[in-house]
Design a protein with these regions (language model features):
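Conserved loop-to-beta-strand segment in the C-terminal subdomain of adenylate-forming
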Residues: 54, 206-210
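Short, acidic/hydrophobic/Gly-rich beta-strand patch recurrent on exposed beta strands
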Residues: 23-28, 145-148, 212-214, 343
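Structural signature of eukaryotic scaffold interfaces centered on beta-propeller domains
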Residues: 201-203
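Rossmann-like S-adenosyl-L-methionine
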Residues: 2-11, 19, 218, 222-405
Length: 405
């Protein structure tokens, strides 16, 4: 087996792809990852990094393109790290995701079950209802956009195809306010400067907009002028919030939220229910796909109206309340206090008297239900990205529900 070195030129055949858009080739038994290459392609590459377990190569040219390769419709791709697969047609992207799920089930989970086809979205542009623009200074001026892949270097963008159009005017208004009043962007190297992120939530059904400015200070300077600039940027802004975040690190939001205009929340409709959304509240970013997901969850739960349902990681109660309409009792459990406050409010404003919410972890929930002699018939889990922890799995097993969704 020949040894690969940084700078080596190669021609490789791409066999598969990772979920983040890197093609996978094999050279003398060694796995080589090629960002931007698609399965089935023959490519000219140069070795960029040789690690202990993997080799990474730079794509120089595509010698034999895949039938699924398309011209990217975004001028910032692939420099911007927001999207990974804009060079692949959408149907093939769905197939890739299905293959990835199947691989996780088989390779990691040791399961022989087959993954169902991925349900694609009818709308693939302008669908996100949340935007997070990191802010930096470049060449003496503030810019906002998205981090380049695996870096903290901001790629300035004028328009992002997957964000709502209102985000462009809001971003522009904040940057103009910063320039006019000489308000510096945050520098994570020196921990100086002010503005860290421009954070936007958009109600897909209501049209309401929440703007949150995250800054490295306890008191935001020129906040009245900021409010005026944002309100002049266009209609729809319902509330403007300031979140101080003076900690080092890459956490976006702070722990405090001070309304500068409005009450700090917006309202949106999902699956025919009304939800109050604060800046830190979890809410699926693709509204249309979230409705399809939740409707499927209710269908899989097979509710007849006589069941007690437990929703772990319930967030603001979106899934819990969807389930409550079809169950005898729905219990939501979430460890974030603000989310539970929103969930209780959402239950009340939707008249859901059979929904109950608790701020605790899953292990505590299992003990509480046991003490109350309550056994859930159905448990629904929609965990954060890191997945369901081992102790939560043990708690679910101990509760012995008839169905887990």
């Amino acid at each position: 087996m020949s040894e690969l070195h940084r700078g080596d030129p190669l021609q490789v055949s791409i066999e598969t792809a990772t979920i983040d858009g890197s093609g996978v080739a094999r050279v003398d038994g060694q796995v080589v990852f090629v960002p931007g290459a698609l399965p089935g392609e023959r490519c000219s590459v140069r070795i960029a990094h040789v690690g202990r377990s993997a080799v990474f190569a730079q794509l120089l040219s595509v010698l034999t393109p895949s039938a699924h390769r398309v011209e990217p419709d975004c001028p910032y791709f692939p420099l911007c790290g927001g999207c990974a697969l804009r060079h692949m047609d959408y149907e093939q992207e769905l197939a890739l995701k299905q293959t990835h799920v199947q691989s996780c089930l088989t390779r990691i989970g040791g399961q022989t079950i087959s993954a169902l086809p991925i349900t694609g979205a009818a709308q693939t542009d302008g669908y996100r209802n949340k935007v997070q623009f990191p802010v930096q200074e470049q060449d003496g001026r503030p810019v906002a956009g998205f981090f380049s892949g695996k870096t903290h270097r901001v790629i300035p963008v004028r328009h992002c195809r997957i964000q709502p159009d209102c985000a462009d005017a809001i971003r522009g208004a904040v940057l103009a306010w910063m320039e006019q009043y000489h308000i510096r962007a945050y520098d994570e190297q020196t921990h100086t400067g002010y503005i860290r992120h421009i954070y936007i939530r958009f109600g897909a059904e209501s049209g309401q907009i929440l703007v949150c400015i995250v800054a490295n200070c306890a008191q935001l300077p020129k906040k009245k002028q900021l409010v005026a600039a944002l309100l002049a940027a266009g209609p729809g802004i319902t509330t403007i919030v300031f979140s101080p975040n003076t900690k080092k690190g890459n956490t976006v939001l702070g722990t405090e939220f001070h309304p500068l205009y409005g009450d700090g929340t917006i309202t949106d409709m999902l699956c025919g229910l009304q939800f109050r959304l604060s800046a830190p509240a979890f809410y699926q970013v693709n509204h249309a796909q979230a409705e399809r997901l939740y409707e499927k969850a209710v269908q899989l739960a097979g509710l007849t109206g006589n069941e007690t349902v437990l929703d772990l990681y319930c967030g603001t109660g979106t899934i819990t309340l969807c389930l409550a309409r079809h169950a005898k009792k729905a219990i939501g459990v979430e460890i974030v206090p603000q989310a539970i406050e929103d969930a209780k409010f959402n239950a009340a404003q939707n008249g859901m008297e059979n929904a109950e919410f608790f701020c605790m972890d899953a292990g505590q929930a299992a003990k509480m239900l046991a003490d109350r002699r309550t056994r859930p018939d159905v448990i629904v889990v929609d965990p954060p990205r890191k997945g369901v922890s081992a102790d939560v799995i043990e708690a679910i097993s101990a509760m012995a529900p008839q169905c887990v969704v």
